[in-house]
């Protein structure tokens, strides 16, 4: 009788390629990461967005990740379903002026909670008659509640930096209305007291809010899902909709504990850049340990390239470790 098969680990690090191979990347060696990349199969290009690749068929019984818009999923983290409302995520961003277009700055904007609440309160008063409600919590994205159906296709904020904003504007039935909302918010933020104070301190102003992930409130329904370890609120919210919880990524030992706990399928994602030492100790070292201990298959997505690493890696001793910047360049 055959056994249960290898443990499946799918790992997404969408930002690591740019961080390791880009100009000015730190000259830091990551032994576990280098071992895994050196001994894995040849990389394969992935066309799907990284979250879709990571989730695979896990959410297929509920229509896939495409049926789990970010807005309602983030709302689920607050314990609300609100099936009669449309929800969108709002990302505070800093826009830069290029030669002939606007683009989102690479560096994320950090707002103190009091700053965020002050901006949200003023915007809420301005847009109250339009049926918009602004919600600020402890997460990077705010929430926008809308009292009517609103349908459009939007671009997730992790795909924005450095690109022409004109090419990324919302599309679909209500795309023009959402674009008008973006422009109106920009005008309201231009001389907002929070931004005036930030500029006086030498901090980048929040001169735009990027709405994304529009969808109706999602009714919760139980679904058996793989174990999830991630810092990504959208994925955590999608799991919450179906009665599952997720582990965080940053806590020391969190992933290692999960891998040692007997799970047969684990999805792992670091959506935001992390310090080299942290990603090595909290991600790559536990993955290497799992490979050494037993029958494990790791599918590792770095940027838009996926590598498979399995039991054969232990025999590929002739493949020498090299700095990630050299391998990924």
Show where each model-derived region lies:
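…; additionally, a secondary subgroup of soluble metalloenzymes is captured
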Residues: 1-329
